[in-house]
């Protein structure tokens, strides 16, 4: 797997909150979250949609970016969501 293939993503959950994570394969990770095999948070508050915040980075950079996103306020995450790349399944 390419070392510069990691992405930071936001998931909009059914409670209108955002869940942030990283993955080298966001589509596969969304499937895991959707089927209850992802994070505990997304097992409780089901995913509605996912968007890529940043991509094409190594794992360490992705982890640092994830931490930065998690420190944002809800309003800042909403703004980031609006600017983020839509997933092919989102129309």
Curated annotation (Swiss-Prot):
Gene3D superfamilies: GIY-YIG endonuclease. Coiled coil: none annotated. PROSITE patterns: GIY_YIG. Residues 4-83 form the GIY-YIG domain. It comes from the Bacteria. InterPro entries: GIY-YIG_endonuc, GIY-YIG_endonuc_sf, UPF0213_domain. Belongs to the UPF0213 family. This is UPF0213 protein NMB0361. It comes from Neisseria meningitidis serogroup B (strain ATCC BAA-335 / MC58).
């Amino acid at each position: 797997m390419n070392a510069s293939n990691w992405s930071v993503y936001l998931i909009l959950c059914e409670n209108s909150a955002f869940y942030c994570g990283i993955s080298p394969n966001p589509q596969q990770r969304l499937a895991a979250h959707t089927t209850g095999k992802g994070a505990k948070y997304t097992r409780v508050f089901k995913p509605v949609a996912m968007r890529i915040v940043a991509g094409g980075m190594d794992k360490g950079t992705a982890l640092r970016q994830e931490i930065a996103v998690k420190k944002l306020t809800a309003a800042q995450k909403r703004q980031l969501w609006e600017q983020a790349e839509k997933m092919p399944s989102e129309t």
